[in-house]
């Protein structure tokens, strides 16, 4: 029996809403990455973009356990000598509330063109408001 593959533009897609308030950072990111890839669908294929769209709200209230709020560091490099910059979790949340979640999700997606395309299907918002009411997102518990 042959395996049936969806064409990427014909694959049925849904919109999901995840409230990250008080939820662990890694669990929210793992659930989101799986939904973006489409691993919850029977038609999953690792080389296709057939996943769903995910809207995450309250990203600024995402939880980390232990001392990670002050000990977890995020590094960026400008490319110049001595251009390494570091900031801890609390500092990054204060500066860019959605960034820790985006970094965690990006790390859980495939590297390369497919992963970059999948990352465009997630929308992360710091507060409880989002502009995707018209898509009627389905609320998902993490």
Swiss-Prot record:
Organism the protein comes from: Treponema denticola (strain ATCC 35405 / DSM 14222 / CIP 103919 / JCM 8153 / KCTC 15104)
InterPro entries: Ribosomal_uL13, Ribosomal_uL13_bac-type, Ribosomal_uL13_CS, Ribosomal_uL13_sf
GO-annotated molecular function: mRNA binding; structural constituent of ribosome
PROSITE patterns reported in the protein's UniProt record: RIBOSOMAL_L13 (PS00783)
Record's function text: This protein is one of the early assembly proteins of the 50S ribosomal subunit, although it is not seen to bind rRNA by itself. It is important during the early stages of 50S assembly.
Family to which this protein belongs: Belongs to the universal ribosomal protein uL13 family.
Record note on quaternary structure: Part of the 50S ribosomal subunit.
Protein name: Large ribosomal subunit protein uL13
Keyword annotations: Ribonucleoprotein, Ribosomal protein
Biological-process GO terms, alphabetical: negative regulation of translation; translation
GO cellular component term of the entry, any: cytosolic large ribosomal subunit
Coiled-coil annotated spans: none
């Amino acid at each position: 029996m042959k395996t049936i593959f969806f064409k990427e533009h014909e694959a049925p897609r849904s919109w999901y809403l995840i409230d990250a308030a008080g939820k662990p950072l890694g669990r929210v990111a793992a659930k989101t990455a799986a939904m973006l890839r489409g691993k919850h669908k029977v038609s999953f294929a690792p080389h296709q973009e057939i996943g769903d769209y995910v809207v995450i709200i309250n990203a600024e209230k995402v939880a980390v356990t232990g001392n990670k709020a002050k000990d977890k560091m995020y590094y960026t490099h400008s490319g110049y000598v001595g251009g390494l910059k570091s900031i801890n979790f609390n500092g990054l949340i204060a500066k860019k509330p959605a960034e820790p979640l985006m970094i965690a999700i990006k790390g859980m997606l495939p590297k390369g063109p497919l992963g970059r395309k999948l990352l465009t299907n997630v929308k992360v918002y710091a507060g409880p408001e989002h502009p995707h009411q018209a898509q009627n997102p389905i609320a998902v518990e993490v």
